[in-house]
């Protein structure tokens, strides 16, 4: 992708946020790349196997941008009105990647897969959360040869949420992904709205091997008001 980097701490359209998952997965497989403007909130590749005869899902970032929402990436540990965290299983460690903003928390087991990536965005401008949740799984469904295992739109710790799990093809490999987005609201009087996204990715043929670690991360994922 042709690169265009935005200031790391400025407010930016959510497209910059949502595609970081794709960049992170691509970078793990292929080495550093320069992200473009759209490339930080989408979990799907730029091409997909969705038939043109069916209605193509609209990605979350595209919906949010269409209603004028912008997002400011913030470090999970810097939040004063929310607790957002994931555990680090034994053998996992923080992973640095030039394609990922410093405010993104990423851990991995070894130098490749599996990985877990946690992102938080402070959202600006009001929007319909129920409508946004309809687009919460679109990026995954647009992935090449995506096969869904399960999904849910049940609340997470009392906050609106969407989850999807499945497998897809990327750079000649079959990957397994678990992805949850949460729209928490901070404490009054500000009642700041956020987008939290956790994406866990492994090689599909190693998903069982790493299942206990992945389940521990999912079980220990916290999004809670302080």
From Swiss-Prot:
InterPro entries named in the record: Lipoprotein_LpqN/LpqT-like
PROSITE patterns: PROKAR_LIPOPROTEIN
Membrane topology: Lipid-anchor
Signal peptide start and end residues: 1-29
Lipid-binding residues (covalent, N-palmitoyl cysteine): 30
Domain of life: Bacteria
Lipid sites, type S-diacylglycerol cysteine: 30
Name assigned to this protein: Putative lipoprotein LpqT
Lineage, top ranks: Bacteria, Bacillati, Actinomycetota, Actinomycetes, Mycobacteriales
């Amino acid at each position: 992708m042709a690169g265009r980097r935005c200031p790391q701490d400025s407010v930016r359209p959510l497209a910059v946020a949502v595609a970081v998952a794709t960049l992170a997965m691509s970078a793990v497989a292929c080495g550093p790349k320069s992200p473009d403007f759209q490339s930080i909130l989408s979990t799907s590749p730029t091409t997909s196997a969705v038939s043109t005869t069916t209605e193509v899902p609209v990605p979350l970032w595209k919906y949010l941008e269409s209603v004028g929402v912008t997002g400011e990436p913030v470090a999970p540990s810097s939040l004063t009105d929310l607790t957002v965290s994931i555990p680090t299983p034994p053998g996992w460690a923080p992973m640095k990647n030039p394609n990922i903003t410093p405010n993104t928390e990423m851990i991995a087991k070894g130098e490749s897969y599996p990985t877990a990536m946690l992102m938080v965005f402070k959202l600006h401008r009001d929007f319909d959360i129920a409508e946004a949740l309809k687009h919460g799984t679109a990026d995954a469904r647009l992935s090449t040869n995506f096969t869904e295992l399960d999904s849910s739109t049940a609340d997470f710790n009392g906050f609106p949420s969407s989850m999807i799990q499945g497998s897809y093809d990327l750079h000649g490999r079959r990957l397994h992904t678990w992805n949850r987005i949460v729209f928490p609201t901070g404490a009054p009087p500000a009642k700041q709205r956020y987008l939290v996204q956790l994406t866990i990715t492994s090689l599909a043929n190693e998903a069982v091997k790493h299942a206990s670690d992945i389940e521990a991360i999912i079980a220990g994922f916290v999004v809670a008001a302080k």
